[in-house]
From Swiss-Prot:
GO BP field: tRNA 5'-leader removal
Full protein name: Ribonuclease P protein component 2
Subcellular location: Cytoplasm
Gene: rnp2
Enzyme class: hydrolase
Amino acid sequence: MIEMLKTLPPTLREKKRYIAFKILYDEELKEGEVVNLIRKAVLEYYGSWGTSKANPWLVYYDFPYGILRCQRDNVDYVKASLILIREFKEKPVNIICLGVSGTIRKAKIKFLGIKKPKRWFVIRRERLKAKKQK
């Protein structure tokens, strides 16, 4: 019999924060380019150990705005590394941190100006099958 690992209670889980940012660049950047730009900046400033500890992850991107997830204890290091980005593809680039929030929804409302952000719900297969049969 296979035993499943127990999930950690909320008090022991790593706390996350969401950094809203704006990119100032001449051309539109693709999501992959932004991920590489952020990853490179955090690695240069914070090192591989610090990068794994901060765990930066691009959650939302719609040029020129984006939301980056990181660990609560390392928010300041990630913000500092974003500010230090100076050029990309031999052109000047600047990333402005708009603010930090505890949820993606509040970051979108407060810093990106999205009035009613879409919520993603998990739809059960049974409901989908029932709707298709009707």
